[in-house]
Amino acid sequence: MKNIKWLFFDLGHTLVNEDVSQRKRIENAVSYLNSVSVSVTYEQFYHEVQNASRNFKSPFITAFSKFSHDDVFIPYPAEFEVLYDDTVPVLSALKNKYDLAVIANQFAGTDKRLKNFGIYDDFKFVLASSDVGVSKPNPVIFKTALEKAGCWLLRLRGLYDRRQN
């Protein structure tokens, strides 16, 4: 990796453990659906989330629409997110050798979340899909990131939780 200058990180399931937040959001969705007489289990909903993810679709919204067309917003409980144990030491080691950035499919407020975790300053820039209006794997988000980095594709590595990202 001697010619690599930049490392682009995803956020969820890469630096931040979102397991509890996702579980709670699915539980809330299932509870809502059951309350409006839609019979669905946690396992069924989770299965649809996984299918949507594999098919490059918005996992939660796609799964919810499989069971209901109600215009209901089930909030994502970000307060249950935590950094993985190795996140801080790994970033501390890498930022001395590489320029780091976050490119993630995230809602507005990603900067604030990273500041709350104490890792915002480890990154040269943070690019959320909400900033660009498209989500990974749309090439526009990657092109925007390359322009911000002033970097050729061959001088970076992406560290993501799924290969389609």
Protein language model features and the residues they cover:
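Conserved Lys-Pro-Asp/Glu-containing loop-to-beta segment of HAD-superfamily phosphomonoesterases
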Residues: 2, 6, 135-165
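N-terminal helical cap/lid subdomain that shapes the substrate entry/recognition surface
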Residues: 2-89, 111-112
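Short beta-strand segments
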Residues: 10, 102-105, 160-161
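Conserved H-loop
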Residues: 39, 120-124, 152
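A short, structured active-site edge motif that brings together acidic residues
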Residues: 45, 122-133
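Anionic, Ser/Thr-rich low-complexity intrinsically disordered regions
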Residues: 54-55, 103, 134
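Substrate-recognition element of Asp-dependent hydrolases with the DxDx(T/V) motif
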Residues: 69-80, 87-117, 126-129
